[in-house]
Regions:
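Long, contiguous binding/interaction regions
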Residues: 1-79, 87-113
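Basic nucleic-acid-binding interfaces
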Residues: 84
Length: 113
């Protein structure tokens, strides 16, 4: 898949938490969020931890474990919200899943290039 750039925002990073506390983002700074998301995209570790929490881990589709060692994430505070730029070759479905694990449904996708 071709590399794409995703432009995302989170209104209040201090409230950006996923459904599973043990997998959620725990920081408050844009830099720490960028590092957490970048790690989640570059390796399958977060996905593997999520899979282990499922009632039937063997039934989970392993295609979602794909990672992109070259993924980059930049984040910066802009007024009262955080602007995030993700560059990756991963499909949107994988990015969305990992974002939801880290930040719940607090993020908004604004553009893809």
């Amino acid at each position: 898949m071709a590399t794409q750039r995703y432009y995302i925002s989170i209104d209040d990073l201090s409230k950006a938490r996923g459904e599973y506390a043990q997998l959620s983002f725990e920081g408050i700074s844009p830099d720490s969020f960028a590092a957490a998301l970048q790690s989640a995209l570059r390796t399958p570790a977060l996905w593997e931890r999520w899979k282990a929490l499922q009632p039937d881990p063997d039934a989970i589709d392993d295609s979602m474990s794909t990672s992109d060692a070259g993924a980059t994430v930049k984040a910066e505070q802009s007024d009262l919200h955080t602007e995030i730029e993700v560059t990756t070759s991963l499909p949107h479905s994988i990015l969305k899943h990992r974002l939801n694990l880290l930040a719940g449904r607090t993020w908004k996708l604004h553009d893809v290039k």
